[in-house]
Amino acid sequence: MPRVMFTISYSIKPESRDQYLALIVEMKNHLTTVGKHNYSVFESKGKKNQFTEVFVANSLEEYDTLEDNMDEKAQELTSTLQSFVDDGGMKYNTIVEAV
């Protein structure tokens, strides 16, 4: 079964950086412990305040349930995070393991 990688890339407002970093720590903890997701957050090298969230699902079926399995706390954290994103918005990408 091929794995699936789902990414969300965005830049945050510079004045929101400290709040964002505190929130993303809480979000990662919640999604990996409570939600049992394979989830990481990366900052682009050389591009301060540009981040990519990465979810790795072990199958297409698991990927299809990612959003359905977000509890109320995860939805609240995501909503707060969106307020830190700059006017460029979020860019989504889904890739499926080839081999």
Language-model-derived ranges and their functions:
Residues K91-V99:
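Short, low-order "capping/linker" segments at domain edges
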Residues M1-P2, V99:
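Absolute protein N-terminus
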Residues P2, T52, Q75, N93-T94:
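Residue-level marker of intrinsically disordered, low-complexity segments enriched
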Residues V4-Y10, S40-E67:
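Short, well-ordered beta-strand segments in beta-rich or mixed alpha/beta enzyme
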Residues S11-A22:
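Short, surface-exposed ligand-recognition loops at beta-strand->loop->(often short) alpha-helix junctions
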Residues H30-Y39, V56-K91:
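An amphipathic, aromatic/His-enriched active-site/gating alpha helix that lines ligand/cofactor pockets
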Residues K13-E15, N58-L60, A98-V99:
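Generic structural motif
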